[in-house]
Swiss-Prot record:
InterPro entries: Aminoacid_DH-like_N_sf, NAD(P)-bd_dom_sf, THF_DH/CycHdrlase, THF_DH/CycHdrlase_cat_dom, THF_DH/CycHdrlase_NAD-bd_dom. This is Bifunctional protein FolD. HAMAP family: THF_DHG_CYH. GO terms for cellular component: cytosol. Homodimer. It comes from the Bacteria. Pfam families: THF_DHG_CYH, THF_DHG_CYH_C.
């Protein structure tokens, strides 16, 4: 068995087209285009790449992009003041603070300061709580993107055993909630999980989000399982790889996402979908 690819490039392009159509419908109805404010503190090279990709996505979708590039020395108080200013602006629909932040700034404090209806990352406790009670408003981007990929591939999660490896607030926890909302049986694994390979071997659907190159081995994947690789890791030779040993896992899985070309592309597309949703909440 060789797995079929779940192609993030094709699926994200289709989602961007839908977002662009939604933006066009707004402007044709006499409403303004959605606006996304992106705040970058410091000069983390990976963050700069992510921010550039988000700006390109905005241009493709017709969303106005507002960039706030702040020095590494920016105080938490000054960052919170900028968030307050953007919260108050009626012409700004989404606010994104690029993570990670410098060590002297508490990310939880900043995330909680964002108006939940402008929290297009979906990280605010209000939005996480709504997802937990099956009343999602703005959903965390990567898990939402994964669910769109599964739907596009015609993969139903209902009644399936899904194993999520990783318990971060950004991916692992909301991913489990998304799967649970679609009636999967969900197991969350983490660094204290006993006999992790055996837990993973029972999975019909595996979502790997640990940030360790090729952490999930091919022989952990039971025949016919669906493998979703959220990881993006840069190796010493400059090449990118995921959290799954792709070449080995694809010989066991029925479907698998590649890295690059998989979940990462969906994260930007779902961010823009959230920005359109946020604009429609406001007007």
């Amino acid at each position: 068995m060789t797995a079929q690819l779940i192609d993030g490039k094709t699926i994200s392009a289709a989602l961007l087209d839908r977002v662009a159509a939604g933006v066009k419908a707004r402007t044709e109805a006499g409403k303004r285009a959605p606006a996304l404010a992106v705040i970058l503190v410091g000069n983390n090279p990976a963050s700069e790449v992510y921010v550039r990709n988000k700006k390109k996505g905005c241009e493709k979708a017709g969303i106005q992009s507002l960039a706030y590039d702040l020095p590494e020395s920016t105080s938490e108080a000054d960052l919170l003041a900028l968030v307050d200013e953007l919260n108050a602006r009626s012409d700004v629909d989404g606010i994104l603070v690029q993570l990670p932040l410098p060590r002297h700034i508490n990310p939880e404090t900043v995330i909680e300061r964002i108006n939940p209806k402008k929290d297009v990352d979906g990280f605010h406790p209000y939005n996480m709580g709504r997802l937990a009670v099956k009343m999602p408003l703005l959903r965390p981007c990567t898990p939402r993107g994964v669910m769109i990929m599964l739907e596009h591939a015609g993969i139903s999660v209902e009644g399936k055993h899904a194993v999520v490896i990783g318990q971060s607030n950004i991916v692992g926890r909301p991913m489990a909630l998304e799967l649970l909302m679609e009636r999967a049986t969900v197991t969350i694994c983490h660094s204290r999980t006993r006999d992790l390979p055996e837990e993973v071997k029972r999975a019909d659907i595996i979502v790997a989000a640990v940030g360790i190159p090729r952490f999930v081995k091919g022989d952990w994947v039971k025949p016919g399982a669906v493998v979703i690789d959220v990881g993006i890791n840069r190796l010493e030779d400059g090449k990118l790889c995921g959290d799954v040993d792709f070449d080995a896992a694809k010989e066991h899985a029925s479907w698998i996402t590649p890295v690059p070309g998989g979940v990462g592309l969906m994260t930007v597309a779902t961010l823009l979908a959230n920005t359109l949703d946020a604009a429609n909440l406001h007007a």
